[in-house]
């Protein structure tokens, strides 16, 4: 049975976001501190981490580039890369903490 959403919600997969506001994934900008500040002013918006290079994440999976806390739910991550095997490994690294994984393939 399909879950209905109202005009003030967005549905991505099985995740319902109770806001039509989303923070864009900007490398060097949307770090944990900014996301925490945005959450105080917009408690229901979708927060997205900085864009994360799949190569960097696979090389250093414990680096703080993917740091989030429970208040960021739903948590969205954008991974960038052009090598399918690295993109898959990156998605697996983030699977436990990500509600949404956005894939950016450079052209």
Which role fits each region the language model picked out?
Residues 2-11, 26-93:
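Glycine-rich, positively charged N-terminal anion/phosphate-binding segment
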Residues 43-44, 98-100:
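A structural motif
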Residues 49, 100-107:
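Non-cysteine beta-strand/loop elements that form the S-adenosyl-L-methionine
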């Amino acid at each position: 049975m399909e879950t209905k959403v109202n005009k003030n919600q967005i549905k991505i997969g099985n995740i319902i976001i109770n806001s039509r506001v989303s923070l864009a994934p900007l490398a060097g900008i949307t770090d944990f501190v900014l996301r925490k500040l945005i959450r105080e002013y917009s408690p229901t918006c979708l927060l997205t981490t900085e864009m994360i290079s799949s190569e960097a994440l696979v090389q250093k999976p414990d680096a703080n580039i993917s740091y989030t806390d429970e208040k960021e739910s739903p948590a969205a991550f954008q991974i960038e890369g052009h090598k399918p095997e690295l993109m898959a490994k990156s998605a697996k690294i983030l699977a436990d903490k990500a509600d949404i994984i956005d894939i950016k393939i450079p052209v």
